[in-house]
Design a protein with these regions (language model features):
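Bacterial N-terminal signal peptides
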Residues: 27-40
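Hydrophobic H-region at the start of alpha-helical membrane spans
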Residues: 30, 360-371
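C-terminal membrane-anchoring or membrane-association module
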Residues: 373-391
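Glycan-processing catalytic domains of CAZymes
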Residues: 46-356, 361, 372-377
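Residue-identity detector for glycine
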Residues: 2-8, 41
């Protein structure tokens, strides 16, 4: 948003012996150009879209987490949501997330999930809300435990059967014909283990690997329906050949007809959960570069990392630290404009006045006040000042 700036009054000159009443009119009129500039300055800063033309047809999917409980916000966090330290059971919070995402041009959420009573309940609530709001869903199945060790194959197979039988037929999962499941952590499993789970279920589900390089994908490509790389910690300024690596991975997935979901993130900082790497956000430039690199890799979708991963600080959800900046930036990249969104303090539909509109209203009110004051001064002076002789 443009700044208010500072504007001086042009001096009123009486050297041609005009009536003093005119000088007050000059004062009033001298404000008009300044306020015109002010109004222009209140307009939102234009953002050049990186998803122009045919690129807009590429789905933008944000990774979404439903694991939050109020006590979780007390550990390993340096930023917090504008909506407060919520529980993922809070329906109004979830509904607001979905509405914000849709307004920003996000097509769907990739939901982190495995079958537990709590996560199933939350997934079902999200399905209902997303269906009503027109947001699509996919699943990132958490194949590793909290120690980053692989879950038993029998557990994974059972969970995917539950998903297939209970949820997969819902139209909210209709992104690529069949419901999409990204198996997180496939690099920890042998081809035989992946085959044991994937082969009997690919008739009903699109099962993607989550391999981190082409060599890893090559060992599984005939067992899965593509690859989705969750690369949240890359620094585009320092990683050599970063865009080329994504392009290579895209070609590998497409070589035998698989899907390729390319990653993009706004930044990264997982030091409070044991990490050491920090990728600065650079006021949105990091995300812009990562989005552009992802698009260059000819993806079938972009996996935006993330909506609300606050522990690794990849979130774009409106927050205390970044406010609405990253949702607005996504909207600008996706749509070419910042929408007049969002009542970010509310769970109501986003139909309230935006910050640029509020600034314009304030500027107009200021203009009106100046005109009224100036006209009042004119009226008072005109009663007491006679015309100058000779006019």
């Amino acid at each position: 948003m443009g700044g208010w700036g500072s504007f001086g009054l042009a001096p009123c000159r009486d050297q041609f012996m005009r009536p003093r009443v005119i000088s007050y009119l000059d004062v009033a009129l001298s404000w008009l150009p300044a306020l015109a500039v002010l109004l222009v300055g209140c307009a939102p800063t234009p953002i050049t879209p990186v998803m122009d033309g045919e690129r807009k047809a590429i789905p933008l999917l944000a990774f979404y987490y439903i694991w939050f409980d109020p006590l979780m916000w007390e550990r390993a966090k340096v930023d917090y949501p504008l909506l407060g330290r919520y529980s993922s059971d809070d329906r109004e919070v979830m509904q607001q997330h979905v509405r914000w995402a849709r307004q920003a041009g996000i097509d769907g959420f990739i939901v982190s999930w495995k079958s537990t009573q709590k996560l199933n309940r939350r997934l079902e609530q999200l399905m209902e809300i997303a269906r009503a709001e027109g947001l699509k869903l996919a699943i990132m199945y958490q194949g590793l435990d909290v120690e980053r060790e692989p879950l038993p194959i029998e557990r994974i197979a059972s969970d995917l059967d539950l998903f297939r039988d209970r949820y997969a037929e819902d139209p909210v999962f209709d992104l690529f014909g069949l419901p999409l499941v990204i198996w997180s952590g496939t690099w920890k499993f042998s081809p035989a283990e992946v085959a044991q789970v994937a082969n009997p279920r690919r008739e009903h589900l699109l099962i993607l690997a989550s391999e981190r390089n082409t060599q890893g994908y090559a060992r599984l490509h005939y067992l899965v329906d593509g690859n989705a790389y969750y690369w949240s910690s890359v620094n585009p300024e320092t990683f050599p050949g970063y865009p080329e690596k994504l392009e290579e991975m895209g070609r590998a997935a497409h070589a035998d007809g698989g899907l390729w979901i390319a990653p993009a993130a706004p930044g990264f900082d997982a030091r409070l959960v044991g990490g050491t790497r920090v990728v600065e956000r650079n006021n949105g430039e990091t995300m812009r570069r990562q989005m552009e690199a992802a698009l260059r890799s000819s993806p079938d979708a972009i996996g935006l990392i993330s909506w609300n991963e606050f522990s690794e600080n990849t979130h774009i959800e409106p927050s205390e630290k970044y406010r609405t900046h990253y949702v607005e930036l996504v909207a600008g990249m996706r749509l070419g404009e910042v929408p007049d969104i969002i009542n970010f303090e509310s769970s109501e539909p986003a139909e309230t006045q935006s910050a640029p509109d509020r600034s314009r209203a304030l500027a107009l009110a200021t203009l009106a006040l100046l005109v009224v004051v100036s006209l009042g001064a004119i009226a008072m002076r005109s009663r007491s000042v006679s015309p100058v002789e000779g006019e």
